[in-house]
């Protein structure tokens, strides 16, 4: 059976989201149709506002509604340490543990030659410029995901930063290899920060 065009378009829209296949998209579409109209309009408005009102911090490249973001603006944070993460959601995972008090740099991806993603496609050049412009940074913690791409990115960053004399460390591997940082619990992340090693 073919769906009416509006439902088909809605299902197609949901399948564009990561991890959403046709069955889940269909389930979500029919759930939306069962919702009260006010709730659907509120949901649609939230989507539009998030897309329209959010931007990226000009310093750390985290998603934010102010520029610079709250973390970069916070004068109480340790400005001698920058934690490099792949995505904004990884930064949020690090913040949840409430132990790391330094600054961040969001790469927006990882080096992945198989996917055609090179160093120039993520925010590595911006990180290097930031380190050149700010002499107070003494340590860069590379907190990329423990995947092949994350490891390759960590090694690439380490090779660029080492000659500057800035200490480069990597999170300890209490984190599962092949896993994503955002799914790690606070205790695991805390142990990983404590056990970080120099690259």
From Swiss-Prot:
Transmembrane segments: none annotated. It comes from the Bacteria. Disulfide bonds: none annotated. A zinc finger (C4-type) spans 57-72. May play a role in DNA repair. It seems to be involved in an RecBC-independent recombinational process of DNA repair. It may act with RecF and RecO. Keywords: DNA damage, DNA recombination, DNA repair, Metal-binding, Zinc, Zinc-finger. This is Recombination protein RecR. The keyword Metal-binding applies. SUPFAM superfamilies: Recombination protein RecR. It holds the Pfam family Toprim_4. It comes from Shouchella clausii (strain KSM-K16) (Alkalihalobacillus clausii). Belongs to the RecR family. SMART domains: TOPRIM. Residues 80-176 form the Toprim domain. GO terms for biological process: DNA recombination; DNA repair. The keyword Transcription regulation does not apply. GO terms for molecular function: DNA binding; zinc ion binding.
């Amino acid at each position: 059976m073919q769906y009416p065009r509006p439902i088909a378009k809605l299902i197609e829209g949901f399948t564009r989201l990561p991890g959403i296949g046709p069955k889940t998209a269909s389930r979500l579409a029919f759930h939306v149709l069962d919702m009260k109209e006010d709730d659907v309009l509120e949901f649609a408005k939230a989507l539009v506002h998030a897309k329209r009102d959010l931007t990226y911090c000009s310093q750390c490249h985290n998603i934010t509604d102010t520029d610079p973001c709250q973390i970069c603006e916070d004068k109480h944070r340790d400005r001698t340490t920058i934690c490099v993460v792949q995505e904004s959601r990884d930064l949020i995972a690090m913040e949840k543990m409430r132990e790391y008090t330094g600054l961040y740099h969001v790469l927006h991806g990882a080096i992945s030659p198989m996917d055609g993603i090179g160093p120039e496609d993520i925010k590595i050049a911006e990180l290097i410029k930031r380190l050149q412009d700010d002499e107070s940074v003494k340590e860069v913690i590379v907190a990329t995901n423990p995947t092949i791409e994350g490891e390759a990115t960590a090694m690439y960053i380490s090779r660029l930063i080492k000659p500057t004399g800035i200490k480069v460390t990597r999170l300890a591997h209490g984190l599962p290899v092949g896993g994503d940082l955002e799914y790690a619990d606070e205790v695991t992340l805390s142990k990983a920060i404590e056990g970080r090693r120099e690259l």
